[in-house]
Amino acid sequence: MNVADLLASSRHCVVFTGAGISAESGVPTFRGPGGLWERYKPEELATPEAFARDPALVWRWYKWRQEVIYNARPSPGHYAIAELEAMGVVRGVITQNVDGLHQRAGSRLVVELHGSIWRARCVKCGSVYILDKPVEEVPPLCRKCGGLLRPDVVWFGEPLPQEAWRAAVELASVSDVLLVVGTSGVVYPAAYIPRIAKEAGARVVEINVEPSAITPIADVFIQGRAGEVLPRLVEEVKRRLRTRQALTP
């Protein structure tokens, strides 16, 4: 099965991404070797209980993460996905990442299943703030009511945002090709997305540096770095589309 042919023929390709694609931008992963969880215990930082216990500690960690991401650049994989969208091949991106690198690369329709590190939400009045740079004061406070702000991300033990989950399920359900990039496939309910697409009739194509929990249901598994594989795929898809246009009377 040729992946470039699949993409060139696709009417509704959707991309599903995990931490692996951002690791190529220098953003530490949670679960890979050298990932963030090797340096910190997740229960100390990424839970509602941890935030209630020590919001300043949690925010110092998120400020550090914001600084890493702020100084990072989207990877060639991010740019390739945005280019496929600009070509009309990709109709949407579902991501487990909270870094906003897809948007910085130019992707327009991005569903963020786990929230965004570039938003903060007041725990008292619910006001949401868009952040264009790392927070300065720790912990930040709501300008409207003085309440504590928290990162607008999904912590361990919290449900996914309903609106984002509905949008992701809808995209996956109508996809004819699901391109899975850089995810371990072990974080639920996000890991259901490839299965939802598969059951709806989509071809599942996985690009990963090593086999994952998704690999057994993938129609095609391409082993490699997203930043190397995806730009090559973009060029192959372009050639096929040009050939078709040339043959069209």
Curated annotation (Swiss-Prot):
Keywords linked to the UniProt accession: Cytoplasm, Metal-binding, NAD, Transcription, Transcription regulation, Transferase, Zinc
Cellular localization per UniProt: Cytoplasm
The keyword Glycoprotein is assigned to this record: no
Source taxon at top rank: Archaea
Binding residues annotated for Zn(2+), in chain numbering: C122, C125, C142, C145
A Pfam family per the record: SIR2
Gene3D superfamilies: SIR2/SIRT2 'Small Domain, TPP-binding domain
Sequence positions that bind substrate: Y62, R65
One cellular-component annotation, GO: cytoplasm
Cofactor note as given: Binds 1 zinc ion per subunit.
Enzyme class (EC, first level): transferase
Cofactor(s) for this UniProt protein: Zn(2+)
GO molecular-function terms, A-Z: histone deacetylase activity, NAD-dependent; NAD+ binding; protein-malonyllysine demalonylase activity; protein-succinyllysine desuccinylase activity; zinc ion binding
Record-listed E.C. numbers: 2.3.1.286
Record's function text: NAD-dependent lysine deacetylase and desuccinylase that specifically removes acetyl and succinyl groups on target proteins. Modulates the activities of several proteins which are inactive in their acylated form. Deacetylates the N-terminal lysine residue of Alba, the major archaeal chromatin protein and that, in turn, increases Alba's DNA binding affinity, thereby repressing transcription.
Family: Belongs to the sirtuin family. Class III subfamily.
Name of the protein: NAD-dependent protein deacylase 2
Higher taxonomy: Archaea, Thermoproteota, Thermoprotei, Thermoproteales, Thermoproteaceae
Gene behind this protein: cobB2
